[in-house]
From Swiss-Prot:
EC number: 4.2.1.20
Annotated S-S bridges: none
Molecular function GO labels: tryptophan synthase activity
Protein name: Tryptophan synthase beta chain
Gene: trpB
Catalysed conversion reaction: (1S,2R)-1-C-(indol-3-yl)glycerol 3-phosphate + L-serine = D-glyceraldehyde 3-phosphate + L-tryptophan + H2O
Enzyme class: lyase
UniProt cofactor(s): pyridoxal 5'-phosphate
Cellular component GO terms, alphabetical: cytoplasm
HAMAP family the record matches: Trp_synth_beta
Family named by the database record: Belongs to the TrpB family.
Role of this protein: The beta subunit is responsible for the synthesis of L-tryptophan from indole and L-serine.
Modification type N6-(pyridoxal phosphate)lysine: residues: K90
Keywords assigned by UniProt, alphabetized: Amino-acid biosynthesis, Aromatic amino acid biosynthesis, Lyase, Pyridoxal phosphate, Tryptophan biosynthesis
Amino acid sequence: MERVPNEHGRFGDFGGKFVPETLMLPLEEIEAELDKALADESFKQEYIRILQHYSGRPTPLTFAPNLTRQLGGAKMYLKREDLNHTGAHKINNAIGQALLAKRMGKKKLIAETGAGQHGVAAATVAAHFGMDCIVFMGEEDIKRQELNVFRMKLLGAEVVPVSSGNRTLKDATNEAIRYWVAHCDDHFYMIGSVVGPHPYPKMVREFQRIIGDEAKEQFLACEGKLPDVIVACVGGGSNAIGMFYPFLQDDVRLVGVEAAGKGIDTPYHAATITKGTKGVIHGAMTYLLQDEYGQIVEPYSISAGLDYPGVGPEHAYLASIGRVRYESVTDEEAVAAFRLLAQTEGIIPAIESAHAVAKAVELAQSMSPDETVLICLSGRGDKDVQTMMRHLGAKEGEDVAAIR
């Protein structure tokens, strides 16, 4: 495989910088500082130190014996990003970008958020580093994720509701970029996934690759070999790139799981790679959901973190060369996996992560007991319990058996 991105920020045909002239200089400044930071041993040491002593890394690799026994196929392992401080992988990237912002002398952070986990992570690091933070969030996601909205405000962030479009992640990102254009002198835009113009997809990958770096070392120590299959959910795709990147040169099957919503052949899904076509969104060439006139088709998923109409350009590239296989899982399949993991292992996953669990369960059942499947459990499901209660028809105070 060729080394990507190239000097123009391209991953094959994908990526690049499709932005207004006013953002070219800020992006060039970020790229220059990022390259210097990644080559600076003291920066890397400070990043690792904060991850260890503030976020709680390394996160464990957990064997799932009950799930394995019930499926009767491959051995199931979980990379526990749900055990990070703030409850998801998003903190890895937020710490890295906050350190870079601090290095650049920026005092204010801008973030967009869907499920709320990146917003919480941004608000958390802003509090930790003594910065201001403004988070843009779609009104629909605010309703779905009211606990995370309260957390952000509790941490001192300003949460700006976005009422345009479908009122979800795409629209929050649009507003965050507009705000950054007008305030780029003293604000740092902290993108939460491997999306956007160069150098953001590369930067977020570098701050998330610790997931796969740790998992590789842990798996070798545990099994004496690499996993046969690795599965991760894909919205923008940062947890998946973080997990996949260290394994790209290895003989390991990599499977990304998109949201099929109410069905891959209905209008209600967010399966960008499976159903999308090439186009530009949020400053990068990638696959996206669009109509014949190039207008964005609104995505749908039960998961606020997966209903994005684009995908990280590196994922688009990996799909185009066939290195990663991208499949999809419906709302109902994800909900079933959410309950399955909770009831077999006592682990409540984020509904985003449950999409990966669902696909891993399907794959494992056709594999032999001497084979292994590694799931990136990108976050915990506390934030989704109310959504699950509504979805399953259970009311507060009703017997828990009602949701079995």
